[in-house]
A protein has these predicted regions:
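Short, well-ordered alpha-helices that flank and scaffold nucleotide-derived cofactor binding pockets
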Residues: 12-16, 110-114, 165, 200
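Active-site loop/turn elements of alpha/beta-hydrolase fold enzymes
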Residues: 30, 59, 126, 177-180
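C-terminal, well-structured subdomains that either form a transmembrane helix-short loop-helix hairpin
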Residues: 2-3, 10, 101-107, 218-237
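Conserved catalytic Lys-bearing alpha helix of Rossmann-like short-chain dehydrogenase/reductases
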Residues: 102-108, 155-163, 198, 229
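Conserved Rossmann-fold NAD(P)-dependent oxidoreductase catalytic core, especially the SDR/UDP-sugar
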Residues: 80-84, 91-99, 103-154, 172-174, ...
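NAD(P)-dependent short-chain dehydrogenase/reductase
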Residues: 135-136, 149, 165-221, 226-235
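A structural motif corresponding to the C-terminal end of an alpha-helix
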Residues: 51, 111-118, 159-171
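N-terminal Rossmann/SDR dinucleotide-binding element
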Residues: 1-87, 94, 115, 120
Length: 237
């Protein structure tokens, strides 16, 4: 998922641990994102950080699209996998969403099972696997026959089904955050979608245009600051 919004903050949090739990951190990066990833990584890594390196790959391919030498080295090592790569566009076509979110997760699971000294899979799901259910949804409830608003929700649901089918052979922790927003203190974010899209739209309206409540003006929004999420993931993980 690097250099994505959540993954970059997760890497930063892991590097700030003292001591860092990992001797080496390997970041799988799409080829088209390599230059951006290199710049982002240079901002995060200091001289006393553990080894952090980028590996070009593709989660939809066997061995996650890595070079054979990289795949072999990781199979021999004692590793944990953090799987954050996904397509989040709520208007994404079904075929693309399925290929990235479901097929990609299956390839991650395949690779995990092929590792000789595999430790744990950390799978970042979403609270929206609950779909159109109402009321309280508990962590041990996944498939309740629910419907979904879009292909993002449905494919993340199917991806989590794939993860749960194999967690007897693959030790797994599943995280289901809500809508992830910027830092709770600074507000820093690189995102422009979700609630930010609506807020930016409202801010562009002329100041003399009256604000009108549409729908339930007192409704709650399921959001979580990225620093809270990442700190929780590091603590739980």
């Amino acid at each position: 998922g690097f250099p994505g919004f959540i993954t970059a903050r997760l890497v930063q949090a892991l590097l700030e641990e003292s001591p860092c739990r990992y001797r080496e951190i390997v970041l799988l990066v799409e080829g088209r994102m390599k230059a951006i990833a290199e710049r982002r990584l240079s901002e995060l890594v200091s001289g006393d950080s553990p080894t952090v390196r980028l590996v070009v790959g593709d989660i939809t391919e066997p061995d996650l699209g890595m070079a054979e030498s990289d795949a072999k080295a990781l199979r021999r090592a004692k590793i944990e996998l953090w799987h954050l790569a996904a397509i989040y566009d709520l208007a994404v076509p079904s075929t693309l969403a399925y290929r990235i979110n479901v097929d990609g997760t299956e390839r991650v699971l395949d690779f995990a099972e092929s590792c000789k000294h595999f430790g744990r899979l950390h799978y970042i799901s979403t609270c929206y696997v609950a779909g159109l259910r109402s009321g309280r949804c508990f962590e041990d409830e996944l498939d309740c026959g629910q419907a979904f608003k879009n292909h993002y929700e449905s494919t993340k649901f199917w991806a989590e089904k794939c993860v749960q089918k194999r967690w007897e052979s693959i030790p797994t922790t599943i995280y289901r955050p809500g809508i992830v927003v910027g830092d709770s203190v600074t507000g820093e974010t690189i995102k422009g979608d979700g609630p930010y899209f609506i807020m930016n739209l409202l801010m562009k309206l002329p100041k003399w245009v009256p604000m009108v409540d549409i729908g339930a003006s007192q409704a709650t929004v399921n959001i979580v600051p990225v620093d809270f999420l990442v700190n929780a993931m590091v603590e739980i993980g």
